[in-house]
Each structure stands twice: as C-alpha cells, then as structure tokens.
C-alpha cells in the first residue's frame, strides 16, 4: 500500500499557522516524530517528503501553488508515481465545523473550499478520502477571507493543537489498519 497524504494551505511565512493552513500544520505534526524534513520540489510545485511507515511507502505533500491551485500539485504527483485516487488522503480546514472538530469523509463535494475544488477539477473526481478540521466561522463582520487567513486566538490555538494530536493518532491508526472506514468510526467527532 502506497499512500499520498496531502495537507492544504498557502506557502510562505505570511500564512504560517493561519486557519487556512491547518492542513500544513497537520502534516508537520504527523512527520515530526519520523525525523524527516519537507523539501521543495519544483517539479510537483510542492514541499514533499517520503518515508516508510509499517513497511509501506508514504508520501506527504504540501502544495506550494497557493490554495486555489492545489489540484495541479496533486494531479502531477499522482501521475508521476502512478498512484490512484484510492491512494489519496487530503487534510484541510472546514469553516462549517466547530473549531477543533474532525470529520473523515470518503467522498463528497468541495463544500465551497477552493483547494478541494481545484483537486476535484484536476483529478476528475470527488471520490477521495479526506480529513476535515473545523476552524469555525467568523464572528461579527469579519470577512471569510480575513478570517481564514488570520491566526487562531489563544483559546482556539490550544484546541487546534490538541486536534492536530488527534489527527496524528488517526492517520497513524489508519496506516496500521489500512481501513479508512474503521478510522472514521473511531475518530470522527
């Protein structure tokens, strides 16, 4: 079993640890204990790392195309390594979920998320596994753009860091069991 795990976000220090970058944050958390480092790969327009977990080859990528063109990196990577959508898991933020909630899905629409829209457009299907991390909706009169590109307040930051630990455990559980549905049942919520 070879897997491609994609975290969505925007490249650059300006966007580091913003709400829209929880996909990048999740990958950083997952690979940290593996003693591997992401490196820039211009061919795929992504930061990439490959490693073996439980004897299986696992690729992690963070597209550097900016969110709205994430699908370009995903399509190129899948094609180059002859992987299928069944090998793909995408981790990203979700405005419609409470901060810190996790939802595993096996397919579905983009739900207004431009990174997911781009992936669906580029790979030609919405039938791929995903892990959504709730970031909540803006309060008051803040625009959605300013909200998702903003950092978490202190309370939500603690919640998100705990959530990232849960995502790390869930991904590792999945890589051991090779059963996304079982992982969904155990970790959704």
UniProtKB/Swiss-Prot annotation:
Its main location: cytoplasm. The keyword Amino-acid biosynthesis does not apply. The keyword Thylakoid does not apply. Signal peptide: none annotated. GO terms for biological process: protein quality control for misfolded or incompletely synthesized proteins; rescue of stalled ribosome. TRNA binds at residues 15, 66, 68, 114. The record marks 10 as: Discriminates between blocked and unblocked aminoacyl-tRNA. GO terms for cellular component: cytoplasm. The record marks 93 as: Stabilizes the basic form of H active site to accept a proton. The active site is at residue 20. It catalyses: an N-acyl-L-alpha-aminoacyl-tRNA + H2O = an N-acyl-L-amino acid + a tRNA + H(+). Keywords: Cytoplasm, Hydrolase, RNA-binding, tRNA-binding. Its EC number is 3.1.1.29. It is found in: Cytoplasm. GO terms for molecular function: peptidyl-tRNA hydrolase activity; tRNA binding. It is an enzyme of class 3 (hydrolase). It holds the Pfam family Pept_tRNA_hydro. Belongs to the PTH family. This is Peptidyl-tRNA hydrolase. The gene is pth.
């Amino acid at each position: 079993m070879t897997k491609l795990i994609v975290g969505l976000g925007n490249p650059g220090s300006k966007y580091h640890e913003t709400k829209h970058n929880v996909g990048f944050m999740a990958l950083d958390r997952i690979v940290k204990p593996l003693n591997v480092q992401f490196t820039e790969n211009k061919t795929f327009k992504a930061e990439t790392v490959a490693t073996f977990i439980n004897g299986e080859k696992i690729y992690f990528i963070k597209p550097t195309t900016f969110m709205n063109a994430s699908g370009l990196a995903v399509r190129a990577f899948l094609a180059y390594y002859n992987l299928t959508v069944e090998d793909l898991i995408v981790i990203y933020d979700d405005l419609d979920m409470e901060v810190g909630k996790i939802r595993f899905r096996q397919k579905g629409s983009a739900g207004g998320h431009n990174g997911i829209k781009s992936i669906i457009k580029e790979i030609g299907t919405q039938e791929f596994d995903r892990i959504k991390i709730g970031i909540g909706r803006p309060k008051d009169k803040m625009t959605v753009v300013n909200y998702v590109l903003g950092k978490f307040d202190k309370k939500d930051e603690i919640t998100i860091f705990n959530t990232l630990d849960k995502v790390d455990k869930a991904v590792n559980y999945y890589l051991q069991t090779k059963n996304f549905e079982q992982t969904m049942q155990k970790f959704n919520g």
